[in-house]
A protein has these predicted regions:
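An N-terminal JmjN-like helical accessory module and its immediate linker preceding a catalytic domain
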Residues: 1-16
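Active-site region of the double-stranded beta-helix
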Residues: 16-116, 124-155
Length: 156
């Protein structure tokens, strides 16, 4: 359902000239707008205004937590992902289509399906584990406290 909107967004981002530094939506010094690595397409940070109205409607519930640094992660099947890592700030991940699992530190994997979300507190090691089901996920940093009842899975 959301693939068409995401593909159009990726095409739009791909037509941009080389990113300039500093990029107001990207705190890193990377100039790549998106990259394809080990089966996963990921974008650099995207302004919320770049998303379609359908995707913005999904994000509306979380705007009160002041999200920023939106990134898309898409795969058409099983992929290796990016391995164990920690993020700066609390991370909110929303599965808008498909399915993905996350392993947080040494816990059992939790599965996110379409519409599910997960909050991972700053400093908690985690990694995504894709499945054979195509997926689209949005990741962002939140600047305000997110209560556990606002997300499907909570690792605060």
């Amino acid at each position: 359902m959301y693939w068409e909107e995401i593909i159009e967004l990726i095409k739009t981002l791909g037509n941009e000239p080389n990113s300039t530094f500093p990029n107001p939506y990207n705190e890193s010094d990377e100039y790549e707008i998106y990259k394809y690595e080990r089966g996963t397409l990921s974008t650099s940070y995207i302004n919320i205004e770049e998303f379609s109205e359908e995707v913005k409607n999904i994000l509306n519930k979380y705007l009160k937590y002041e999200p920023e640094n939106f990134q898309l992660f898409c795969s058409l099947g099983a992929s290796d992902g990016f391995g164990p890592h920690e993020d700066i700030g609390d991370t909110l991940i929303i599965c808008i289509e498909g399915q993905i699992s996350y392993i947080i530190e040494n816990t059992k994997p939790v599965v996110l399906k379409s519409g599910d979300s997960i909050l991972i507190a700053e400093g908690r090691e985690h990694m995504g584990v894709s499945s054979t089901i195509p997926r689209i996920c949005i990741s962002c940093r939140v600047n305000r406290y997110v209560p556990s009842d606002e997300v499907t899975h909570y690792f605060g």
